[in-house]
Amino acid sequence: MERPEPELIRQSWRAVRRSPLEHGTVLFARLFDLEPDLLPLFQYNCRQFSSPEDCLSSPEFLDHIRKVMLVIDTAVTNVEDLSSLEEYLAGLGKKHRAVGVKLSSFSTVGESLLYMLEKCLGPAFTPAVRAAWSQLYGAVVQAMSRGWDGD
């Protein structure tokens, strides 16, 4: 896999980093639009959400959004040395597998990430920026997928 363009990723992430919860909410709203079957996977204290809006407004889910955005931020920070995150990301993959996430759903998460970036960046979301983020996300998912492979 080609290495992502670090400067394009860092520069575009600066805009997102200013309001990670807001942009993360856009990402997950899009995810639930594209793959509504994921909603039941998010249960906190045995509470099932009746709608994406119910989920997106819950304090527990907002905490999950913050954590996801922090993982993305960590990947951006380490974009030139993603191998340093491989063990952590494989563990994260294993946790997702344990709660019933299918590896195939990460394709939809990637689409949702690109959607969020496009909404946040507007005209600055160029084909080169899109390609750089696709490469970064692909590398992250590749590392996370090791959590599905091994025990």
Swiss-Prot record:
One of its GO terms (cellular component) is mitochondrial matrix. It comes from Canis lupus familiaris. The keyword Oxidoreductase applies. It is an enzyme of class 1 (oxidoreductase). This is Neuroglobin. Monomeric globin with a bis-histidyl six-coordinate heme-iron atom through which it can bind dioxygen, carbon monoxide and nitric oxide. Could help transport oxygen and increase its availability to the metabolically active neuronal tissues, though its low quantity in tissues as well as its high affinity for dioxygen, which may limit its oxygen-releasing ability, argue against it. The ferrous/deoxygenated form exhibits a nitrite reductase activity and it could produce nitric oxide which in turn inhibits cellular respiration in response to hypoxia. Phosphorylated during hypoxia by ERK1/ERK2. Phosphorylation regulates the heme pocket hexacoordination preventing the association of His-64 with the heme metal center. Thereby, promotes the access of dioxygen and nitrite to the heme and stimulates the nitrite reductase activity. Phosphorylation during hypoxia is stabilized by 14-3-3 proteins. It is found in: Cytoplasm, Cytosol; Mitochondrion matrix.
